[in-house]
Amino acid sequence: MWKKHLVSLGYGYKLGVDLPGESRGFIPNAQFYNKIYGEGRWSANTIISIAIGQGEILATPLQIANLCATIANRGWFITPHVVKAIQDTIMPSQYLEKRIPTIDRQHFEDVAEGMRMAVTGGTCRLANLPGIEVCGKTGTAQNPHGKDHSAFIGFAP
């Protein structure tokens, strides 16, 4: 079920952004964990680190930005595309098609509120700009070979 939700959010497949070399990322499934740990030798406790971004899920920066846009839109996204110019007001339908994830819209409100609280009193306080409502999320990828990698993503609803 969770994989279905992740796919509906744009993870685990190529978004189709008109750029060469786009990666689909990776969403592990039971077969993957059976291969690594052995059938019946893993459980939710084995993979709980996925919940904090330290598991086996791989996502491209564009997939993460697209998820952030989905949260900002409160439950929809349009596949990102690269365009050189827009010359008239008639847009091809591929640039306008809204994708609706399988997650209830109210959950996006809750996540956006949490991202706002992260900016007003959490790890994103430096993004708290006077007169602009900003929602944000920080993250750190641990690097066993050197310095950790820190990231910030946000939007202004």
Please provide the spans of the model-predicted regions.
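Beta-lactam-recognizing serine transpeptidase/beta-lactamase-like catalytic domain environment
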Residues: M1-P157
